[in-house]
């Protein structure tokens, strides 16, 4: 051992011992796992070999307990703790996941202050020194004054073996002359307190200003149900309660027995050597349990015969337990307290609920958070066990188990960690609610290496396209029985649904049509359609029209399949669509959804988005979830040939903004970039002719149809940005067509996003620096717009967009559309805040401040050169 070790009896000597221990720990912290494990093995071996001498010394010094049982406790503290942690990593990198970029590194805490109780003076010392050595911590022990000799002897055994195996000298120290003053000093100066003792000591530990692992008192009740194995239950309680004369804090303090088996249980206790007190004897023992309201120290760890003699009661020397049949669970009843001796309260319960109530009171009043025990048939009594586990505020619920042995773990259940310090959680005023082990003596550093998100590309299962493809694509639906068509009155009255209806008739599919969809569809409209669906019970839904009809169809689909769905929940904002709080209901279980667009713009046929308006509040609910993706999309330009100019312009420019925002999005990928670029090229080349010539240029119409769908699939996966956020609110507040609103904002957004020094950049792992200017330059290059620098290319792109807007009759400013200036300015702040909170804002490459959104609105209202 350390021959230079000086006794610690004063504050100065303790300060010196702490300094030496801290220096030793700093050296120990550099040891490898192999060195630590060698020391851990040597220390556990030495403690195990000294289990009998230490047990004898503990009983001789304290006058409490049973030598043979203390031998078992010492053996347990050495063998079971070693076995539990021999293969555990506690040095350096203890866990690594290269795929996720995570490393966990274990570091020691430093110097541990260990308070040791008189009830388990050697086994607890062995336990705490071993787990400290395994975790490369130093430890200073404050023994109980009544057990200082045996506690120090146990610590000395572990220290000698550890140093011989290579541990630094002074890594374990102790107070030779314990006092409240020195205990408080060591708790103040240590890095962590590991306190096992009475409530006063635990409270002092938590009041020291240092992190503490303190445990509370136990007052374990054991409920014996009428389904229990009585022989097992009684023998288990006796085995536990007599172990070391009841000094394990988890030992049973009372049994609560159902009335139907009470007499049989009582008889079994008597048969097995327990002594049931009569009324007079109960009073005498009651007066001996508590002295001035506190537990009588003279009964702790004594035999039943000795305690009876103290109370003036004559019992056989062989009596195992003194049992008092009592009725009150109140604190005024001495038998209802923790007794730390072979004295047991016995209660009669009318039924299991009554038994649980009694046990609950006993736990809350005397052992909150510690341990509760129950004996029952775990098969037939499963519901009772579940009820018991739910009701008891105890961190260990032991079933058919002697609680002294069961509570400390690894004896009757091998997943319960072995420990001699049992946490009681917040109920017991503790910071830990489990059996204390090595993980509680480590600081774990987490090294998180940047990783990029998993990306995806989601699209409808089938996308059919080509002018005239409608009847061929519909033929795939031949096995469906009943079709529900969703459209608007204009399309229905002008025969747009007729080709679909004729094909359905030819295939023998019964069908009906809902044609009350209006622009900006409402919840009332969707509910009306869903009610008709519920009555018709289709297995096929066909949404025919522009964005409104397809969105309405999607919402009706949701209401039809999940009438319980809450739109406020479904419209909840998300940062990552895969991590959203709300789980969207599974779609497609009742009906197969087909989208057939009649406009080239919204791209709703290829997106998981839908917007619905609550007509009572005016609130728009934007829904986004891949469950809303159509199962099939049929993009047939024949359905779009006769779209009016205004619709062609608004929907066409909407598709431009879809592609531009998808390309600039933080979540853009190679999969979406190609779609976005190709759709932009097709739009710039074909939108003017589609606008001017309509059906006279079927190729332009077809190219626009394809471009709109491709742009939709691009933003379905890359998402949109702040242009759409502002357009949504501009349209809602001032009733501008959605595509026009986007057209009015896009120039401002391009310049805003292109800033090389943004106030805030967006947050997404793949987005590592502001590069949107370069992205816009790539678009200009792809469109062959010219320019030498990225800045020139951006201006050329904006000019090209402005020229395109002019060709299709879109005005330059918001004011040009007759929006009253006073009304606009009055409602501006509300519009700004709602735009900021729009779902689309999150994917924007530049995270906008509300003041910046406001300025963009003002620029778009007055024109950039005329901004007030």
Give the residues covered by each predicted segment.
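Carboxylate- and glycine-rich phosphate/diphosphate-binding segment that chelates Mg2+/Mn2+
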Residues: 263, 271, 606-718
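ATP/NTP phosphate-donor binding region
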Residues: 454-540, 814-815
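N-terminal Rossmann-like NAD(P)+-binding subdomain of aldehyde/semialdehyde dehydrogenases
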Residues: 1-103, 271
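Rossmann-like NAD(P) dinucleotide-binding subdomain of oxidoreductase/dehydrogenase enzymes
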Residues: 93-232
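Conserved C-terminal structural/oligomerization subdomain of aldehyde/semialdehyde dehydrogenase
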Residues: 3, 313-453
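Gly/Pro-rich interdomain helix-loop hinge
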Residues: 733, 740-823, 866
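Glycine/threonine-rich beta-strand-loop-alpha-helix active-site module
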Residues: 154, 524-638
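ALDH superfamily catalytic-core signature
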Residues: 8-10, 202-330
